[in-house]
């Protein structure tokens, strides 16, 4: 059985993952509305991944005989001034999520809950990938900044 503290924190993380999914869906829809179908696809894939992360955590709580408590998902921003701004916000957000995951790992370590610590290793590694992916996209968009043909090509590659 999980400690009450870890159980509550994982339920909060489920909400954070679903909020992340909602954010990336909003980014996808905004990119699509501006004609960036490839960027929209990139964020759509992120939306699916974040839902998977929440599902993994829900399954984990169920496997440990703990109740999943779904809470309301807070409203997200729905418009951005540029594709670059979307990716910059993505990186900032993923850094926040990394902090949340690290907090879960710290609680599990404090509780000497080795099963939870082991499960969280996947999330820790995933966050390294998420931050790297966002940084890579910032670099790519900055590389073509001001070049409409370059942005068109980048968008096609992401489709």
Report residues per predicted region.
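Iron-associated oxidoreductase/ferritin-like identity signal
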Residues: 1-159
């Amino acid at each position: 059985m999980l400690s009450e503290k870890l159980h509550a924190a994982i339920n909060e993380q489920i909400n954070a993952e679903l909020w992340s999914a909602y954010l990336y869906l909003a980014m996808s829809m905004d990119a699509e509305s501006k004609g960036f179908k490839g960027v929209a696809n990139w964020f759509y894939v992120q939306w699916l991944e974040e839902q998977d992360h929440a599902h993994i955590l829900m399954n984990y709580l169920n496997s440990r005989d703990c109740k999943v408590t779904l809470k309301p998902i807070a409203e997200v921003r729905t418009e951005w001034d540029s594709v670059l701004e979307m990716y910059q916000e993505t990186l900032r957000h993923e850094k926040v999520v990394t902090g949340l995951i690290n907090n879960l790992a710290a609680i599990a370590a404090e509780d000497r809950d080795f099963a939870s610590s082991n499960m969280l290793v996947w999330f820790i590694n995933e966050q390294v990938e998420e931050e790297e992916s966002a940084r890579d996209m910032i670099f790519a968009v900055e590389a073509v900044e001001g070049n409409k043909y370059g942005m068109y090509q980048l968008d096609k590659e992401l489709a």
